[in-house]
Design a protein with these regions (language model features):
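A short acidic, Gly/Pro-enriched loop at the edge of an enzyme's catalytic core
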Residues: 126-135
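SAM-dependent methyltransferase
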Residues: 169-229, 239-247
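Conserved class I S-adenosyl-L-methionine
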Residues: 2-72, 262
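Core SAM-dependent methyltransferase catalytic element
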Residues: 254-273
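A short glycine-rich, Lys/Arg-flanked "PGG" loop and its adjoining helix->strand segment in the class I
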Residues: 152-164
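Class I SAM-dependent methyltransferase SAM/SAH-binding core
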Residues: 77-123
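A short SAM/SAH-binding and catalytic strip from SAM-dependent methyltransferases
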Residues: 134-149
């Protein structure tokens, strides 16, 4: 593991920055994940949303056990409850420590329903065509993939893996909240100028210190950006949720200046027939 952690930057997988590589190789990030995020309203809200979608799919009478795909499964906060509802769930994560944490929390019955695969979200060619009924990528995990083409490539692979009419739930943080943060205007303008000068830097990219890691990477979206990415990848959006600033629920009067007011976005999209 240490030798893998020390891999030169030019040898990192597609869409993976040095900061993300350090993140997925940090054992403490995984072992402390549940306690660190305990009580976060978004993590309860998005889980309910996925389980609601799962319940709707089961009422369609598939005549078989439904299959879900958890993209960036972490410690299994959604995949384990889903498995306990009778679904078969495949959890993907680049962090081996996260996958180990899922196994440690799983009962024997859980392990009969769930699978764990170490995988890079920007390299999903392993997925079978039309094999998934419900896919989800939560807590802005898609934002950890660097580069528009890598993110769209991921979405296209998810689209390919879904059954016709299959559902995809995705969350991103909203870039517009930057302007309200201390120093946000200066940073926003500086990042925009950098995106014009540096081909490896996209407007919306952010690198910051996080839990002992010096260069955590995350791409922050606008509403239009995620809508375009989904549309370009073949998805039709059934439901668009603008979250309030704390991401605890839908934004009140969401039509009013959502770019500046929304904490993030959740999209429920569908693979067109």
């Amino acid at each position: 593991m240490d030798s893998e952690l020390d891999r030169p930057t030019w040898q990192l997988p597609p869409g993976v920055t040095r900061g993300t590589w350090d993140y997925v190789h940090s054992g403490s990030i995984a072992t402390q994940y549940d306690s660190f995020h305990a009580g976060h309203p978004l993590l309860e809200y998005d889980r309910r949303l996925v389980l609601e979608q799962a319940a709707k799919i089961k009422t369609q009478g598939l005549g078989r056990i439904p299959v879900a795909l958890d993209l960036g499964c972490g410690t299994g906060r959604v995949m384990l409850p889903l498995g306990q509802l009778g679904w078969r769930v495949l959890g993907l994560d680049l962090s081996q420590s996260m996958l180990v944490a899922v196994g440690a929390k799983s009962t024997r019955e859980d392990r009969e329903r769930i699978g764990r695969v170490r995988a890079n979200l920007a390299q999903l060619g392993c997925l079978q065509d039309r094999s998934i009924d419900l896919a989800y990528c939560l807590y802005s995990s898609i934002g950890m993939v660097q580069g528009t083409e890598n993110r769209r490539g991921m979405l296209r692979q998810v689209h390919r893996s879904l059954q016709d009419g299959g559902v995809f739930v995705v969350h991103v943080h909203n870039r517009g909240t930057w302007w309200q943060d201390p120093g946000g205007i200066r940073r926003g303008v500086g990042d925009w100028i950098r995106s014009l000068r540096d081909k490896s830097w996209e407007y919306g990219d952010r690198v910051y210190a996080y839990r002992g890691l010096p260069s955590m990477y995350l791409h922050i979206f606008t509403e239009g950006e995620l809508r375009r990415d989904l549309q370009e990848s073949g998805f039709a959006v059934d439901r668009w949720i603008r979250l309030d600033r704390t991401s605890s629920g839908e934004l009140g009067f969401g039509w009013c200046l959502p770019y500046f007011r929304a904490g993030g976005y959740l999209a429920v999209a569908r693979k067109s027939q």
